[in-house]
Amino acid sequence: GCLEWNWSNIFLGKKRVIGIDPSPKFVFQFQAIKNFAGKELPVDVLPIGIEDMPKKLEAFDTVFSMGILYHRRSPMDHLRELRELLRPGGQLVLETLVVEGPEGTALVPEGRYAKMPNVWYLPSPDTLLSWMRKNGFKNPRMVDISTTSIEEQRSTDWMTFESLEDFLDPNDHSKTIEGHPAPTRAVFLAEAP
């Protein structure tokens, strides 16, 4: 869901924030929160995926893709779709899982990754920067990288189901339960030409 990004951008003083999410559950959650806020806020969520957005829209100052890239069967197509949403000079903020390695390295799990069945590609940072340049982005750069910790992502009284600790090798938290490198998240910025 894109809830937190929509609200944080409103608090940063943006004039209009539009999120997209193909999951009805997250759209309804957003609408409930907006309704209880009790005032008209310049933020909305459309119940669609990026593939349903108009092609070559070139309308947005900033586009966020947070935790989406590794769920896409074609990361190159996703990067192109993101670029085509941005106005000239607009900024992409992309957060995704990465693996260590030189340019050209990408983990393509044959089965699950951290118990997730829908993880297709985990590039190295240099590989993702190369993909961004190939898709026409200017000045792509990584601005943060960190290994996800079990203190950050954990079960709580409010979230009682499985969490990161259940997805990691119990004897070696540097690996997933399947033996892959543990989740490392990186944030990238780039501009549309």
Residue ranges of predicted features:
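Conserved SAM/SAH-binding beta-strand->alpha-helix loop
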Residues: 23-25
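Conserved SAM-binding strand-loop segment of SAM-dependent methyltransferases
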Residues: 38-52
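A short acidic, Gly/Pro-enriched loop at the edge of an enzyme's catalytic core
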Residues: 48-63
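A short SAM/SAH-binding and catalytic strip from SAM-dependent methyltransferases
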Residues: 60-75
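A short glycine-rich, Lys/Arg-flanked "PGG" loop and its adjoining helix->strand segment in the class I
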Residues: 76-91
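Short, glycine-/aromatic-enriched active-site segment of Class I SAM-dependent methyltransferases
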Residues: 98-119, 132
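Short alpha-helix
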Residues: 119-142
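Conserved catalytic loop of SAM-dependent methyltransferase domains
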Residues: 138-167
